[in-house]
Amino acid sequence: MERKIRVLVAKPGLDGHDRGARVVAAALRDAGMEVIYTGLHQTPEMIARTAVQEDVDVVGLSIHSGAHMTLFPDVKKLLDENGMSDVLLTGGGVIPDDDIEQLQKMGVGRLFTPGASSEEFVNYIREQVEKKWAQAKTG
């Protein structure tokens, strides 16, 4: 039996709005994924530590504070430093298109903005992780 996709949903920084993160976490659970939700006010170090401890396949950041150009690169760097460069870093929030393009050039996966459907992010995560697992099997 193939294991469930493990997703860490995190709310970095001082943003106190977590309704979107909770909706995402519920949709991923409903799709059969194992979800670890960090709660509010996480530092990049806390997120990376939890990702390592939980051995996740995906880290999803929910950012509505405008600090995405700092938080995504900081988490990416810490994941890489902890041997988790193969973990998909994705997320969403109110992020301008130009910033999305820059973040993706830094190695961040697809980013979802308000209005994205749960089907979109569930399918994206499933496709990316299953592709990684298939590549690992073929070596």
What are the residue ranges of the model-derived segments?
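Short, flexible coil/linker segments at domain boundaries that flank nucleotide/cofactor-interacting
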Residues: 1-4, 84
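N-terminal pre-triad scaffold of radical SAM enzymes
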Residues: 10-14
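Cofactor-cradling patches in redox/metallo enzymes
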Residues: 21-123, 130-131
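The C-terminal output helix
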Residues: 127-139
